[in-house]
């Protein structure tokens, strides 16, 4: 409810300043699907086959995520797109800050449909925080994402709520996961590798700058294609 739309909102605002265009009010709505048993096993859950976990809402996570149903999410975005097409926008950019598979699939599907069935071109921009030749583990609520939100709103990030740094963060205890978990290659001890307690404002500024550059390049390319 906070991190993902806040990051997308600021990226959209700054990209519009650089490339031109207007920014619609932020849609504070996201979706998620149930986790496959294999991912739950890779997180360290022993009873994965009998568990029902939606997104990052593991049983011990203290705050539930603000997940809407996937069909409601898609219908809501569809209606926003329909209204924007009526306003005769030639290029509509959806800046998505949430990496859930279902959310990205729905947005990509709608972008393809509207680009082919209406006069508008719709593209989906997702923040790529790595520079050319750089490999980063974005993860969920790990160092990268925490650094980003520290850069955007450091006053509302309280890392002191975590245990001391020498205490490992088990995937089963927190709504935190490295990319390697979703790739089927979890850490041997099933604990967080890219620790959010290592997050800094400076790193967040660097990641944000990379994401902004990538999105602006994507928008510029779409503009150029429309003019061709």
Give residue spans per PLM region.
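Extended, histidine- and acidic-residue-enriched regions that form the cofactor-binding/catalytic faces
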Residues: 1-93, 97-228
């Amino acid at each position: 409810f906070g991190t993902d739309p806040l990051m997308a909102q600021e990226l959209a605002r700054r990209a519009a300043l650089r490339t031109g265009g207007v920014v619609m009010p932020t849609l504070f709505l996201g979706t998620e699907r149930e986790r496959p048993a294999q991912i739950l096993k890779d997180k360290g859950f022993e009873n994965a086959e009998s568990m029902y976990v939606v997104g990052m809402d593991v049983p011990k996570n203290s705050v539930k995520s603000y997940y809407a149903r996937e069909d409601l999410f898609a219908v809501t975005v569809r209606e926003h797109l329909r209204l924007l097409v009526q306003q005769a926008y030639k290029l509509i950019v959806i800046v998505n800050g949430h990496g859930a598979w279902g959310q990205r699939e729905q947005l990509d599907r709608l972008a393809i449909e509207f680009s082919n069935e209406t006069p508008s071109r719709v593209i989906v921009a997702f923040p790529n925080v790595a520079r050319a030749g750089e490999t980063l583990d974005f993860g969920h609520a790990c160092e990268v994402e925490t650094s980003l939100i520290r850069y955007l709103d450091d006053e509302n990030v309280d890392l002191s709520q975590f245990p001391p740094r020498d205490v490992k963060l088990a995937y089963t205890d927190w709504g935190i996961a490295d990319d390697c978990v979703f790739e089927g290659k979890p850490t041997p001890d099933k604990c967080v590798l890219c620790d959010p307690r290592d997050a800094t404002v400076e790193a967040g500024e660097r990641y944000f700058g990379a994401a902004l550059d990538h999105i602006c390049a994507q928008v510029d390319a779409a503009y150029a294609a429309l003019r061709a």
